[in-house]
C-alpha cells in the first residue's frame, strides 16, 4: 500500500514537472512582438514588467505610455494580473510616404547667387508675392519652429539657424534592425533626406530661401533609415513642446485604426498609439505650441469609408475607423498641397471638414503624362516640383504634402513674432485664418479647406 502511494505521488510530481517544463519551453520558443501599453501608475507598471521579465523598449512618461517586447503568454499574464494596465495593442509604425523620383540631378549652386536660386523657387515667389513678404518680416525673430522628422544636415550652408537636435530613435533603431543607430541623443543624420527638405522650406537662408529665412529651428529625429514607431513621433511632439517651440511641424504620418466600440484591454486596433498621438498634440497646445501636420499623399477622400479603409485592408462594414494621422486629429492645423496652377495636387488627401488650408507642395502630373526623360529634359521638373535643401549639402527638386506643411509652419512663426502672440495658439490660428489665407472662387471646402496661404497678406498691416 505504501509502495502504491509512493508511486502515485511520484507520478503526480512527474506530470507537474513535465507540464512546467513544457510551459517553460514553449515560452522560450514563443515569438516576441512589440506592443504599445497605456498604464495608470508608472512605478507599478515598471515593477510589473520587471517581475515578469518583460523588456521595456520605449517610454513616454508624460503620457503614461510605453512600448514593450514580449511573448503573447507573458502579455496575457501581465494584463490579467495587473489592473494598472489600461490598454494594449500591437505597436503601429509609420513611414515617410513621399513619392521619390531619382532625378539624376543635384544642384550645387556655389557659383550662383541667391537670386538665381530664388528665380527657380516659383513656389516661394508665389506665396511671398515675389519676395515682398521678406521686407515685412519682424526685425527680431524670437519664435521657434520644431521639426518632428528624419533628422537634418545642420552643416548645410543654408541651414545655419538649426539650433537643437534631439534624437528620439533608440539604440539599434526600428525594432532592433538598425545596428548603426547608437541611441545618442545628439545624433542628427538625415538618412531619408526628408527632414532636410522640410527645414529648407521653413527657414533656409542662403542660396535658397525658406518662407521665414533664419528662423530658429529645432529638430526631433524620429527616423533612422527604415520605419518609425508612431510612439517616437508622439515623444518628439512632447519634447518639442517642453522645449518651448512655438510651432511644431509634422510632415509625416500613418493611417491609424481605432475601434470606439471595442472596450477590451487587449486590442486588435491601434488605440494606444492613436490616443498617445492625440494626447501629445493636446499637451503641446496647453504648452502654447501649434502643431501643423501634412495630409497623406494618396489622393483619397479620407471621409469616404471605403477609400480610407482600403489603405489598411479593412472592409466598409467593420466598426473600426481609419484616420489619416496626425492630420485628422483635434487641435492640429491641417495642410494640403496645391500645384503650380493653384489646383489641388493629385496626391493630396482631402475630405469634408478635414483641411484647414492649402499651399504649394508641387505635382507630378507632367511626369506621369510625358515620362521621366521628357520631364527632366524639357524642364517640366523645374516647372512643377519644389526646390529645397538636400541632405548631401546641395539642393534637390521634390513634390509632396511634406513640402506644403512647413511653409505654413514658417509663416505661423512669422505671425507670432509680428503680432506678439507667444503662447497664444488659439488667437494665432484665428488671426492666421483671417489674414493669411486667400480663397479663390473654385476652392471648395472639401478639397481646399479655407483656401491657400498668402504670407504677404498675413504680414501686411
From Swiss-Prot:
PROSITE patterns: SUBTILASE (PS51892), SUBTILASE_ASP (PS00136), SUBTILASE_HIS (PS00137), SUBTILASE_SER (PS00138). GO terms for biological process: proteolysis. Residues 121-459 form the Peptidase S8 domain. GO terms for molecular function: serine-type endopeptidase activity. It comes from the Bacteria. Residues 1-23 form the signal peptide. Keywords: Hydrolase, Plasmid, Protease, Serine protease, Signal, Zymogen. Pathway: Antibiotic biosynthesis; epidermin biosynthesis. Its EC number is 3.4.21.-. The active site is at 149 (charge relay system), 194 (charge relay system), 402 (charge relay system). Protease which cleaves the matured lantibiotic from the modified prepeptide. This is Epidermin leader peptide-processing serine protease EpiP.
Amino acid at each position: 500500500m505504501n509502495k502504491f502511494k509512493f508511486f502515485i505521488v511520484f507520478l503526480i510530481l512527474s506530470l507537474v514537472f513535465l507540464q512546467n517544463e513544457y510551459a517553460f519551453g514553449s515560452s522560450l520558443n514563443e515569438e516576441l512582438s512589440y506592443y504599445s501599453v497605456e498604464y495608470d501608475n508608472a512605478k507599478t507598471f515598471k515593477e510589473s514588467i520587471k517581475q515578469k521579465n518583460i523588456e521595456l523598449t520605449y517610454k513616454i512618461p508624460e503620457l503614461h505610455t510605453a512600448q514593450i517586447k514580449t511573448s503573447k503568454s507573458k502579455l496575457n499574464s501581465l494584463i490579467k494580473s495587473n489592473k494598472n494596465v489600461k490598454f494594449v495593442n500591437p505597436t503601429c509604425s509609420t513611414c515617410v510616404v513621399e513619392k521619390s523620383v531619382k532625378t539624376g540631378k543635384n544642384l550645387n549652386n556655389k557659383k550662383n547667387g541667391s537670386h538665381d536660386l530664388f528665380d527657380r523657387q516659383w513656389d516661394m515667389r508665389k506665396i511671398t508675392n515675389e519676395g515682398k513678404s521678406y521686407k515685412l518680416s519682424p526685425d527680431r525673430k524670437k519664435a521657434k519652429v520644431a521639426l518632428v522628422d528624419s533628422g537634418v544636415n545642420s552643416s548645410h550652408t543654408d541651414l545655419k539657424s538649426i539650433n537643437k537636435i534631439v534624437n528620439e530613435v533608440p539604440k539599434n533603431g526600428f525594432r532592433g534592425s538598425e545596428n548603426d543607430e547608437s541611441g545618442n541623443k545628439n545624433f542628427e543624420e538625415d538618412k531619408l533626406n526628408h527632414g532636410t527638405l522640410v527645414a529648407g522650406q521653413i527657414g533656409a537662408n542662403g542660396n535658397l530661401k525658406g518662407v521665414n529665412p533664419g528662423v530658429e529651428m529645432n529638430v526631433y529625429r524620429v527616423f533612422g533609415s527604415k520605419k518609425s514607431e508612431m510612439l517616437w513621433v508622439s515623444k518628439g511632439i512632447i519634447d518639442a513642446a517642453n522645449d518651448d517651440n512655438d510651432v511644431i511641424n509634422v510632415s509625416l504620418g500613418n493611417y491609424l485604426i481605432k475601434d470606439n466600440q471595442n472596450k477590451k484591454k487587449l486590442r486588435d486596433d491601434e488605440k494606444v498609439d492613436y490616443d498617445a498621438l492625440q494626447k501629445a498634440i493636446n499637451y503641446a497646445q496647453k504648452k502654447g505650441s501649434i502643431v501643423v501636420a501634412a495630409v497623406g499623399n494618396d489622393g483619397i477622400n479620407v471621409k469616404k469609408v471605403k477609400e480610407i479603409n482600403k489603405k489598411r485592408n479593412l472592409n466598409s462594414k467593420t466598426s473600426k475607423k481609419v484616420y489619416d494621422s496626425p492630420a485628422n486629429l483635434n487641435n492640429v492645423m491641417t495642410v494640403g498641397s496645391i500645384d503650380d496652377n493653384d489646383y489641388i495636387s493629385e496626391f493630396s488627401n482631402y475630405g469634408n471638414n478635414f483641411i484647414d488650408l492649402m499651399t504649394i507642395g508641387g505635382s507630378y502630373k507632367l511626369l506621369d503624362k510625358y515620362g521621366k526623360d521628357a520631364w527632366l529634359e524639357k524642364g517640366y521638373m523645374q516647372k512643377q516640383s519644389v526646390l529645397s535643401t538636400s541632405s548631401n549639402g546641395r539642393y534637390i527638386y521634390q513634390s509632396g504634402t511634406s513640402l506644403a506643411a512647413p511653409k505654413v509652419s514658417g509663416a505661423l512663426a512669422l505671425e507670432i513674432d509680428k503680432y506678439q502672440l507667444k503662447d497664444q495658439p488659439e488667437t494665432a490660428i484665428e488671426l492666421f485664418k483671417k489674414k493669411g489665407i486667400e480663397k479663390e472662387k473654385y476652392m471648395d471646402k472639401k478639397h481646399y479647406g479655407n483656401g491657400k496661404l498668402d504670407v504677404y497678406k498675413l504680414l501686411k498691416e
